[in-house]
Amino acid sequence: MIKVGIVGGTGYTGVELLRLLAQHPQARVEVITSRSEAGVKVVDMYPNLRGHYDDLQFSVPDTQRLGACDVVFFATPHGVAHALAGELLDAGTRVIDLSADFRLADAEEWARWYGQPHGAPALLEEAVYGLPEVNREKIRQARLIAVPGCYPTATQLGLIPLLEAGLADASRLIADCKSGVSGAGRGAKVGSLFCEAGESMMAYAVKGHRHLPEISQGLRRASGGEVGLTFVPHLTPMIRGIHATLYAHVADRSVDLQALFEKRYANEPFVDVMPAGSHPETRSVRGANVCRIAVHRPQGGDLVVVLSVIDNLVKGASGQALQNMNILFGLDERLGLSHAALLP
């Protein structure tokens, strides 16, 4: 049985980790931390978990208790894992970080986007970017895994087949993405209030979103060179979901794009390439660790449109983290993650 610790268990990604781990036959949560809710029972805060974690309480982070775990997940704001990851790694504990702390390979670039110096630059070289569809073999050997963000997951999975094949003009990529309100986190913010977010949609961070350098980094790896990406995120009046509409110029009209995508993801358990002409919906992935993709070439022209949908809290966060854990410990990748999406 894998002994699991969770740092920062009171947010949406933390409770989603708990929900998924409750169904995992090879993992047991030993420690869950929260400075603000120390002493509170998990089931008192999240009654949906009654019957699964009745004796588990939030506690103040204790590196000795966490270091006794086989793996520790960080479901925290950026900066927290910087302070604790090194000590846990020294104790022999694997670290899976759901925050942005180790996603970018360049410490200076991280500092520019997050407004503070990187707190553990020495760990960046060994941190493995946890997108299984790209880095599965590296994940198997990792000590420290950086779980991709939600927008980066949907965008990269949608564009990677075109870039790896050298078909798309990498200098003219567009990612037009929509997110549910849970992507903003559980903290109280005016923009997340029902009366503010309901029955409305808005673009934000057009000048530059923190996920932009992460997406660009992944697309550079796929293309083997520089990329030009315009990324525009939007807030939509739904709770869960990411819908990415991706645009790429592909001059070669002889390529069977449907076959290209199907071949690229043929052996990926959590990527579903839908039939030609499909329009995937966010509700089709709600609660499931899956990315559904459809590829279009409107009017047979040079512009290719890829539609990519995920649940931002599952394949975009906690589900992908658990997928990484399964790979890391040599388990079936699908363990604890095979449930269907919730409808309606």
Swiss-Prot record:
User: Pathway, per UniProt?
Assistant: Amino-acid biosynthesis; L-arginine biosynthesis; N(2)-acetyl-L-ornithine from L-glutamate: step 3/4
Q: Which InterPro entries match?
A: AGPR_AS, AGPR_type-1, NAD(P)-bd_dom_sf, NAGSA_dehydrogenase, Semialdehyde_DH_NAD-bd
A Pfam family (short name) is Semialdhyde_dhC_1
Q: Which domain of life is it from?
A: Bacteria
Reaction(s) this enzyme catalyzes, per UniProt: N-acetyl-L-glutamate 5-semialdehyde + phosphate + NADP(+) = N-acetyl-L-glutamyl 5-phosphate + NADPH + H(+)
Name the active site residues.
Answer: 150
- Indicate the principal place this protein occupies in or around the cell: cytoplasm
Record keywords: Amino-acid biosynthesis, Arginine biosynthesis, Cytoplasm, NADP, Oxidoreductase
Q: What does this protein do?
A: Catalyzes the NADPH-dependent reduction of N-acetyl-5-glutamyl phosphate to yield N-acetyl-L-glutamate 5-semialdehyde.
Please state what the protein is called.
Answer: N-acetyl-gamma-glutamyl-phosphate reductase
Which organism does this record belong to? Pseudomonas paraeruginosa (strain DSM 24068 / PA7)
